[in-house]
Amino acid sequence: MLDHESVRRLRACAQALADGTREDSAETVVRRVFAIQAQDATAADLGIRVRGRDITARAIRIAYEDERSIVRGWYMRGTLHTIPSDDARWVLRLLSPRILAATSRRYQQLGLDDDLRQRADHLIRRALAAHGPLTRAELTERLTTLGIPPDGQAPFYLIRHAALTGVLCHGPQRAGEATYVLLDDWLPSTGRFRWEGDSALTEVARRYLAAHAPATLEDFAAWSGLPVTWARRAWKLLAESGVITEYGGLTMLAGRVEELPGPSDTPDVRMLPAYDNYLIGYRTREMSVPALHQARVWPGGGLIRPTVIADGLAIATWSRGSGARSIKVRAFGPVPPQIQREVDMEKDAVVRFLRPTT
């Protein structure tokens, strides 16, 4: 049986958030955690920063746009995530049918029938082939030729549909704004999927456990958006292959518990962005955020506030202040001097990342 502190430290270490664990590049961060939640582009960049060693915003842009080693798209739960580029196609093939099925009622409400969605896919493909990269506004303007009103949510759902069907993905930023490109142009296909069927299901479950364990199959289902029956099958296949071990109702990759280092004299303080994987990668919250303070992290309305953790335990929320170099930290209680020093250092690091001097 693992106690709460051991579970928390193992999870934080898996996420490169404790015991001094940090990666050296944006690509290795994303490979380690498999997916960074990315509906907010700045929060996604901060999610890479907090797991890295001196990674700059410029280095992250290079990984996205020059190296093309990471890519942003609609994956887990149909939400924007950043994942390794060479995983984009097989993950999309596994997840997109469920996402499209779950969106069918919304398509009906917006009057987007199968024929119209297919015509929109073709129009978007032609537009990007001839004129890409294009912004959402530029694609929306072209969709009006199909009778799609430019206001409302229909353009977004059609652009997202084109992503889920493998037409497009996010491309380079233009003046800080996202653009879209043809997936096959931006990330040329190798001609085959790395994993398919059950092998894809077990691989995405294994990646989840590598980045989140100790966890349950219900945690995996909540994170991925896949049915619990699928998660149960993934667990069964992983168990049959000897990949996982059970510890009192929690699952680990075999051998991972032995990797937990002893406690450090210096607290490892990290400033997580809004919507960070460490906070939302599980069905329940009590391991990382004390119950008394959960409403401060999850205030309602779908918001998840930026949070300060020390050795994996939430101790405060934070926000950007009115000044260009201002960070406000709101602690849940008295902060020991040793932890406060680490908080101050982390604040300075976030400011440097957001407002580089050169």
Regions found by a protein language model. Give the residues of each.
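A short, conserved structural fragment
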Residues: E65-Y75, T79, L164-Q173, A239-Y247, ...
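Non-catalytic regulatory appendages
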Residues: L237, S241-L292
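Loop-centered beta-sheet repeat module
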Residues: G152-R233
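Internal, well-folded beta-alpha domain core
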Residues: L123-P155, V204-G248
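Short, cationic-aromatic polyanion-contact patches
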Residues: I83-A88, R174-R194, L250-P263
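Phosphate-backbone binding and catalysis cores of DNA-processing enzymes
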Residues: M1-A137, E141-D151, A291
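Glycine-rich, small/acidic residue-mixed loop/short-helix segments
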Residues: A291, R296-T358
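Short, amphipathic alpha-helical interaction segments positioned at domain boundaries
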Residues: R93-T103, D185-R206, D268-R270, Y278
